[in-house]
Amino acid sequence: EISECLVGSEMCIRDSYPVGFSGDTHITWESLDFQPYFTSTASNIGYGWWSHDIGGHMFGYRDDELTARWVQLGVFSPMNRLHSTDNPFNGKEPWKYNQIVETVMKNFLKLRHKLVPYLYTMNRRASREGLPLVQPMYYLEPEREETYEVPNNYYFGTEMMVSPITDKLDPVTGLAGAKTWIPQGIWYDFFNGRAYKGGRKVDLWRDIYEMPVLVREGSIIPLKDMEGYDNSIENPEKLEVLVYPGKSGEFVLWEDGGDTPEDLDENWVSTRMTKTADENGTVFIVEAAQGNTAVSPQKRSWKIRFCNIQDKPQEVTVNGQVYKDAEFAEDKKLHGTIVILKDVPADA
């Protein structure tokens, strides 16, 4: 069976799968502001699964906006763990907050569930290769001074970087900002598809409903399709895949049965996805599942979202044959195109 051990921040690692936490946090903006730095630098001593008491544990003050921003950080953390002292006034249930914050909390908690395919793959990578999900910005550019000047920025897996908001909204603009170092290349906003040129420091401003999460060009991000939302922990029959323009890219989705030894290759199934981009256009391929296909659905529906690519695909094929039942739609949120394929055999 898979086991884990929850240990406090003062403890060094003494278990194969430790889940650390930053201690009994106070309910203050200052405490929230420390958590992104504490979370990312925990990776420096092998604490890849690091958590914090989302919303704060005790003392401090009541602030609904603070809770919303802390939940946003928690969703883009290794562990998403809402927690508080045993006090009826400190509960973290979304319905205990004002309507706006309740909506924000619910939306982000659902987003966490969507992210499970990506997160599960990244945690397998951490187990096999020792590369933590959350990494400080200087991990990839250790010679770059700017990466040390943004302690609250971090990479979130291979495809994303995060710059949490830890300040209150400006009462005039209704926005709050986060100092951000954008690495070289083109990066896209995870929530709205806006493109940013990298190699510079910027202040990214967002309302209460969003936070700065950027995706590198050429990325492929597998998500659970939340249509007909449920709390199932089974490998999803419907996947939503975000495909970003620019460079060619590749992502290998890894899945297992969830209750088998993770160190044995025969317990895993992999699905390789590639995107090739050149002057002739973009080709996106989902290869047939490889490995223990019994642990994943035998048929899957795919919702492919091409961010900032508005042209309708010239052709969709399955097993080399034109797939005439493909559905197409405009993706207004990410300024692109959606392609839907239903009930595709896993070995196709």
Where are the predicted features?
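Context-gated lysine
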Residues: R81, K92, K96, K106, ...
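Catalytic-domain carbohydrate-binding cleft regions of carbohydrate-active enzymes
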Residues: V7-E210, L214-R216
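Residue-level signal for tight coil/turn positions that link beta-strands
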Residues: G157, Q184, E279-G281, L334
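Hydrophobic beta-strand core residues of beta-sandwich domains
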Residues: C5-L6, V344
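Accessory, solvent-exposed terminal regions and/or long lumenal/extracellular loops of proteins
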Residues: V213-Q321, T337-D347
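Short, exposed "boundary/linker" segments that immediately precede the start
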Residues: E1-I2
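Solvent-exposed beta-strand/loop surfaces of large extracellular or lumenal domains
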Residues: Y188-I208, E315-D343
